[in-house]
C-alpha cells in the first residue's frame, strides 16, 4: 500500500500527508491505510479549489489556462495540509476580516464567494452515515459539509453542492480511479474496511478562576497540575492493555481481565427451601367474577350498588366454613369477617336509600385482621436517646424459597386471550401531532392484539382497586370502609359488563408519608381448590362459601365456590404506581415499535402493516428449557405486555436488583454471541450480586430460571 501511495499521488501531497501523520505521532509505513486516506483527502481538497477564481467584478469563474495577468483571486483558501499553528492563523485572519463565526474544529477550505468554511469528507462507507458523523462532530450551522464517496455518491449541506457539475465529476472520476487501482492490486478491501468513525477532538478551552482552583484541588493524588493530569489521561491508548492501566491508576486495584468464553458462565444458583407462595395484592388466574351484563340498574356506576347487583346474580351461597387455614392467623376471625360483610350488605338492602359507601362496624375480628392497635407505640427520640442499649428490633432474615411451577402457569395465563375486551381504543392516548398517522396505525394494531389479553384485565383491575383504595384511604381515614373489587369490560357482542371479584376492607389510613402503610383485608371469589397447591396459598385463609353451577360440554356441573381471605397492606406510593398500570401498555407498545423500526430500516420502508398482517411469520418470544419459543406477532405483543404487567404486580427490591445486575451478565453473553471477545474481571462478584437477589420472590425466581435457559441456549 505504501508503494502504491507514493506512485499514485503527487509528491507534494505525499510529503504533506507524512508531515501530518508525524505531527500526530503516526507512522506512514505502519498505518498505510490511514496514509492513503490522508493523501486522498488532500487531493480532493486541492481539486475542489483548482481552477476556481473570483474576477474583479466579484463573480466566480473557472479558468483552466489563461492570461496570467488577469486580476483574479483564488475562490477557495486551502486550510487542509498546513500545520496546525499556521492553519489556525489563517482561520483567525479570515474570521477577523470577514466577521464569520470561528469554527470549533479546523475546516478544510474557505469559500470567498459564499463566505463560509467547508468541511470536505471522503468516505468508503455510506455518505449519509459519514455526513451525520461529521455534522454531529462539528455541531455548527455555519460550516458547510460536502461528502464524496468512492462509489460516486455525494452529499452536501442543504443539497447545496457549491461547485459546478463538471468540477465535481472530475473529483468523482479521480476517486473511482483510485478505487480501481487499489482493487487491481488487492488493496481495496483492507482499505475499505479500515475506515473508523469520526473521532471528536474538541479544541481545548481554557479553565480559569474558581473553576481552575477547584480543578487543581480535585486532582487524584500524585498529580501536580491539571495539565499534568490531562497529559496522563491523553496517554491512555483506548485499545491498550487494561490491566496495566488499572494498576497504574491505583495501587489497590489488581484486576486481571479474564477472557469470557462459551465455557465461562455457569447457571445462576436458585435457592432451595419450601416452594414460594403467591404475594400479589389480588388474585390473578384464580380469580372468579360475578357479573352483570348491560347494567342499567338504579345507581349504576356506584361501586356499592354495582357490587350488590352482582352478588344477587348468585344463588348458591351456603354456610361458610374454613377448608384451608392460615398457618399463623386466628382463622375463625377471617370466617367471622366474611359473615359480617354478608350481614352488613344485607342490612344496606333493608334501608330505604342505599348509601354510596359502607363503613363496617369495628368488630373484634376486623380489628384483629386489620392490625388495629397492634403497631408499637411511637416514642419521641429525645426521651430515649440516653438508653445505652437502644437498638432497632431484630428482624429475621427472609427464609429462602424455591421456584414453584405455579408462577410459570400464572404467566402463561396472563398471556392468553379472554373472551372480553378490557380497553377501548383510546386507552393508550390520542394523537398529538399530525405526523402521528403511522403511530396511530401501530397503536390500533397493537390494541387489537392486546385488548382481550388477560394481562390487560389485570391492568384494569389493578388500576380500579388502587384508585378506590387510595380514595378511601384519604376520604375515610378512620373508617373500616368496604371497597368492592370491580372491573368493566365488553363482551364479544359489544355488550357492557360489570364484574365483581370480591371485597376489600381497609383499616385506619392516616397516611402522612409516601411509605406509610394502610392495612386491608381482601376477600376474593375463586373456583380453585387451595388443597391442590397449598404452598401457593400460604398467606391465605380459604373458606368454602357456596356452590356454583357451571355449564360444560356434558351439561351443568356443580363446583364448590371458595373465598380467599388474607391480610395485606400497601402504601401511598405503591397505590400511585398501581393507578398508573396503564403505562405497561405503553411500555410494551414501545418495545414492539422498536422491532418494527428495525424491520423497516432493513427494508427501507414502513413495515407496520406487513408486520401485523403477515400471519405466517413467527417471532422469538422467550427461552424455555425446550429452546427458543416462537409465536405470532400477537403472541409477542401479549408476552411483552404480560412481562411488563408482572413487573408491576410483583414489584420488589429483589426484582430491581436482579434486573440491574443480571443485565450486565446478559450484555456480556450477547457480546460473546456477537464475537466481540468480551473480557471480564471479578465475574464471581457479579454472580454474587445477582444471586443475592434470589431469595423468595416468585417472579424473580421465574426470571432467574428463564435466564438460565437463555444461558444454556445462547452458549450452545
Curated annotation (Swiss-Prot):
EC number: 3.1.-.-
Enzyme class: hydrolase
Keyword Ligase carried by entry: no
Known cofactor(s): Mn(2+)
Positions that bind Mn(2+) 1: 41, 108, 119-120
Cofactor, free-text remark: Binds 2 manganese ions per subunit.
Motif stretch (Nuclear localization signal 2 (NLS2)): 184-247
Motif Nuclear localization signal 1 (NLS1): where in chain: 124-139
A GO CC term attached to the entry: host cell cytoplasm
Record note on modification: Phosphorylated on serines and threonines by host kinases, including human casein kinase II.
Places the protein is found: Host cytoplasm; Host nucleus
The UniProt record lists the keyword Nuclease: yes
Disulphides: none
Quaternary organization: Influenza RNA polymerase is composed of three subunits: PB1, PB2 and PA. Interacts (via C-terminus) with PB1 (via N-terminus).
Protein name: Polymerase acidic protein
Taxonomic lineage: Viruses, Riboviria, Orthornavirae, Negarnaviricota, Polyploviricotina
